[in-house]
Structures are given as structure tokens and as C-alpha cells.
Amino acid sequence: VRSRRQRQMCIRDRPDTLRYPASLTKVMTLYITFDALNKGIIKMNDDLKVSRHAANMAPSRLGLRPGQKIKVKTCIEALIVKSANDCASVLAENLGYTEANFAKTMTKVAHELGMKNTTFKNANGLPNKAQKTTARDMALLAAAMYHHFPQYYKLFSLKKFTYNGKTIYTHNNILKTFAGADGMKTGFTNAAGYNIITSAPVSYTHLTLPTTPYV
């Protein structure tokens, strides 16, 4: 558990044990996307092209088709609410030319943020034995997201969004059941188990809980 105000760990249990990040990977994909938005490299209403590679991603996905176009804003909402693997790959390919190249940037940025035990191999968190992180590193990423991109951080509290006339609801049940919870991301693969980064104001501070995995 990390205090946002004090910027330090206040409770810990095996914070440096290597784990598979599963869909917590998407928080870094979004971090780099928000950085690109801040720098004017992309805009929320820009159209992104969907490749066959992205369209063929395993679930969870939005159901994109090769050759179609999708807005940056929709991709972001789909990552946060539905944890859409196809949308993560779309962002990666449009920002990094290939997903593998984007993953190298993800790892580089992670190390710059002090996430020394993290390696990314894809943008969505689908199984890869070389893709690893720790609870401590995920706490650092969550803090960096809040402090560097406060204007976008509120998106992590989205409970639903609309795509093609259909309302899609969040996987993050803590947003529905814990008063004050304001994000961030859940994840699951068979190899990783269930994991989560969540945050909420408590008394005079704001606590972030990254757990990899939780049961």
C-alpha cells in the first residue's frame, strides 16, 4: 500500500516478488498514450488504423476488424473499461510502428520511472514468460500516472462507455462497491492469477494498492 501524499510505501508484503502483470500492463500503454497526447503527437479524435495483428488478439477485446479505424478516445475507454486487448495493440502499433517496438519503449519508460524489475513484451498483458513486474513497480507506475497526467487520471474511474450504440460496463467491481474508489485497473490470466491496482482517499491521505496477484 502506497501513500500518494507521502509518496512512500506504508504497508508491504513481498513487494519485489516477480509476477506476470496481466492487464496491469495496459496502465503503461496508457501512460505512453497520455504522454503522446500531451506532446501533440496524437489527439483524442484522431483515427487509428486496425491491423490484422491487432484484430486477432485474444479476449477480452472490442471486436475490431482489420482495416477499420477507431478513435484514440475510444481505444482509451476500451482499455480502461473493457480491458480490450485489440485496442491496446492498436495504440501500440500506431505509436510505435510495431507492438514489439512499442514494448521496448514501455520497458525504457518503466526503468526511467524507477521500475527496475519490470520488463514489457507486449501492450496488453497477454501471456509472455519474459513479461514481469512487481507490486512495488506497479505502485510507482500508478503514482507517476497520477502526478504526471492528472487531467487523464480521472478516466480510470469510468464505469461504462458506449461503442457502436452498445453500452459496455467496467470489469472493476471495486468502483461499484467501495465508496471513494477512483481507479485504476484489474487483470487476469491463468499464469498471473487475479491482480489489481486500486486507489481511494482515506482520512488525510490517498492510498494506492497494487496487488500481483490477489486471491
Question: What residues fall within each predicted segment?
Answer:
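Active-site-adjacent loops and short helices of periplasmic peptidoglycan-processing enzymes
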Residues: 1, 5-8, 12-136, 143-147
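Positively charged, low-complexity/disordered segments
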Residues: 3-7, 208-215
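Penicillin-recognizing serine hydrolase domain
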Residues: 72, 97-207
